[in-house]
């Protein structure tokens, strides 16, 4: 298993159903590549992909910066986050980016009313600079880091 860090490794959560795996996992894989590329090969500065069922059953993952991909009907984590996170981007009431970045944790929900809208949410998250904003916050120098 590759190394993970509760503060620097981003957890991408997709739904567990066959439909969610078919449509949302490729989006998560693309986003993981974007995150890993920005991490510059540093061990913890990367992303991992897990399904919502595993995320819910693994409390240790809850401390990680989390990005749920897929609609509330197909992703239990997105279902929860969509109810509590503020809306940052919405287009035509079909595509939604919700996020909360504070000292208690970094949580994001990227979803749409269908697969194309969810893809638009993921792309907007990157193109609008929100991914870079997230990574700047979580990957900034920490005084407790030992060099």
Model-inferred region functions:
Residues 1-147:
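Solvent-exposed alpha-helical segments and adjacent loops
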